[in-house]
C-alpha cells in the first residue's frame, strides 16, 4: 500500500494507464503527431481522424451529436465560454442570469465579471441539504432572464441537483440552461437527448483523462449561439480557435469511452468503499455528514468533526491525501463558502474534510484510513479545551468569551 493514500479524486484523478498509452501514440515522429487542421497531407488527415474518433467518444458519453462537442482547455474555460458567450450574444434579449451560491468558482467569478459589465445575477441560497428546489429557480425568473447555470454534482459535498426538472422549466420559459458537469460526466449517466440542457461543461482530468483538456456541449436543437472568446483560425466551428491538442483530445476521448463502458461496475465498487468509510467513522461523537445523504455522487463524502480544527486535522492525517474544500480555493484559510451557504457556522465549516474515492481506491486503503481518522480525532480532541467543556455539559454557544 502506497502512502499517503489518495482520497482526493474530486480534485483530480490519475490518468488511466489505458488512456496514457493511447496518448503516447500521438506525440512522436512515428505516431499521429500532425496538425488536425492540415488538409494537404496524411499526417494531418490521421490527426483529424483521431480527433474525430475522440469527439465521437465524448459525444457518446452524454448521448450528443459529435458536432455539438467543442474542445476547450478544461471545465473552467467551458464555463467561461458558455456563460460569457451566451451573455454577450443574447444581451439584447436581457441581462439577467440565475445561478447558485454553491457553484464552482469558475461559474461564480465569471458571473461576477458579468456584473461588472452591467449584467444582473441572482445567486440562489440552497436548502441545508445543498439542493436547490425547482420552485426557487422559477421564483427567480424574470422577463429579462437569459441564462440559468446550475452544476449537476457539487465538487465539495457531492450533492446531485435535479437537472431534468430544471431543464424542463428553462425550456418551457425559453431560457438557456447551462450545466457544469465537471464532477458528473463519466460518473453519472447523462443523456442530453432527454435532459433539456443547452450547454454542458465537461472536464478531462476529473474522469481519468489528462489535465488541460475539456469540452463544452453546445446544443444544435434548439440551436444555441455563443460569442467566441478566443479568435484565430476559426477552429471548433469558430467557437474556440487554436490548434487542437491531438494527444490530449485522444486522451479525453479514451477516458470517456472507458468511463461509459465501466460506469456501473466502477460506481458499485466506489459506493461500497464510500459506505465502508462512513460506517467506519460515523460512530465517532459529534461527526456529521454534509449535504443530502441520498442524492449524492457515489465517491463523495464531506464530513464535519466538531471541536477539531480542519487544518490541524489534515496535518494529523498526513497518511491521507484529503482536502478541506475544493483544490481551487484550498490555499485560503477561509471556511468553505459552499458549507457556509448550507448554513454551517464557521467552526463546523472549518472542521470539515472532503474524502473522495475513485477507480484505484482499495479496501486496504479504506481500512487504513478509518483507523487513522479515529486515532487522529481522538488525539486532537484530547488536546481541545472546547471538547472538554462540551463533555462537561457547557453550552458553548452561550459562553461569553473575553476579548484580548
UniProtKB/Swiss-Prot annotation:
Pfam families: Aminotran_5. Keywords: 2Fe-2S, Cytoplasm, Iron, Iron-sulfur, Metal-binding, Pyridoxal phosphate, Transferase. The active site is at residue 328. It catalyses: (sulfur carrier)-H + L-cysteine = (sulfur carrier)-SH + L-alanine. GO terms for molecular function: 2 iron, 2 sulfur cluster binding; cysteine desulfurase activity; metal ion binding; pyridoxal phosphate binding. [2Fe-2S] cluster binds at residue 328. Homodimer. Forms a heterotetramer with IscU, interacts with other sulfur acceptors. This is Cysteine desulfurase IscS. It comes from Shewanella pealeana (strain ATCC 700345 / ANG-SQ1). The lineage of its organism: Bacteria, Pseudomonadati, Pseudomonadota, Gammaproteobacteria, Alteromonadales.
Amino acid at each position: 500500500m502506497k502512502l499517503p493514500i489518495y482520497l482526493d479524486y474530486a480534485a483530480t484523478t490519475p490518468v488511466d494507464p489505458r488512456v496514457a498509452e493511447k496518448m503516447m501514440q500521438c506525440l512522436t515522429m512515428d505516431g499521429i503527431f500532425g496538425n488536425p487542421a492540415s488538409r494537404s497531407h496524411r499526417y494531418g488527415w490521421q490527426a483529424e481522424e483521431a480527433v474525430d474518433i475522440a469527439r465521437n467518444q465524448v459525444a457518446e458519453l452524454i448521448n450528443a451529436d459529435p458536432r455539438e462537442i467543442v474542445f476547450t482547455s478544461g471545465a473552467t474555460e467551458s464555463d467561461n465560454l458558455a456563460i460569457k458567450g451566451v451573455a454577450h450574444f443574447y444581451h439584447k434579449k436581457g441581462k439577467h442570469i440565475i445561478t447558485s451560491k454553491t457553484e464552482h468558482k469558475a461559474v461564480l467569478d465569471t458571473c461576477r465579471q458579468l456584473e461588472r459589465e452591467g449584467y444582473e445575477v441572482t445567486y440562489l441560497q440552497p436548502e441545508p441539504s445543498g439542493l436547490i428546489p425547482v420552485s426557487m429557480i422559477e421564483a427567480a425568473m424574470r422577463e429579462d432572464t437569459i441564462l440559468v447555470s446550475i452544476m449537476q454534482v457539487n465538487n465539495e459535498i457531492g450533492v446531485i441537483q435535479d437537472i431534468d426538472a430544471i431543464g424542463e422549466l428553462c425550456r418551457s420559459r425559453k431560457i438557456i440552461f447551462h450545466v457544469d458537469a465537471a464532477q458528473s460526466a463519466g460518473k453519472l449517466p447523462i443523456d442530453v437527448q432527454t435532459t433539456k440542457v443547452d450547454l454542458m461543461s465537461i472536464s478531462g482530468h476529473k474522469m481519468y483523462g489528462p489535465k488541460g483538456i475539456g469540452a463544452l456541449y453546445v446544443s444544435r436543437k434548439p440551436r444555441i449561439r455563443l460569442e467566441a472568446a478566443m479568435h484565430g483560425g476559426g477552429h471548433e466551428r469558430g467557437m474556440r480557435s487554436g490548434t487542437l491538442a491531438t494527444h490530449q483530445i485522444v486522451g479525453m476521448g479514451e477516458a470517456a469511452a472507458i468511463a461509459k463502458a465501466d460506469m456501473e461496475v466502477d460506481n458499485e465498487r466506489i459506493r461500497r468503499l464510500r459506505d465502508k468509510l462512513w460506517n467506519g467513522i460515523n460512530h465517532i461523537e459529534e461527526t456529521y455528514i454534509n449535504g443530502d445523504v441520498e442524492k449524492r455522487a457515489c465517491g463523495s463524502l464531506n464530513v464535519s468533526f466538531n471541536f477539531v480544527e480542519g487544518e490541524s486535522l489534515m496535518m494529523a492525517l498526513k497518511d491521507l491525501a484529503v482536502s478541506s474544500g475544493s483544490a481551487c480555493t484550498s490555499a485560503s484559510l477561509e471556511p468553505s463558502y459552499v458549507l457556509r451557504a448550507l448554513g454551517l457556522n464557521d467552526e463546523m465549516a472549518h472542521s470539515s474534510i472532503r474524502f473522495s474515492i475513485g477507480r484505484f481506491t482499495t479496501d486496504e486503503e479504506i481500512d487504513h484510513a478509518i483507523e487513522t481518522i479515529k486515532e487522529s480525532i481522538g488525539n486532537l480532541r484530547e488536546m481541545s479545551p472546547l471538547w472538554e467543556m462540551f463533555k462537561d455539559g457547557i453550552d458553548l454557544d452561550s459562553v461569553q468569551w473575553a476579548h484580548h
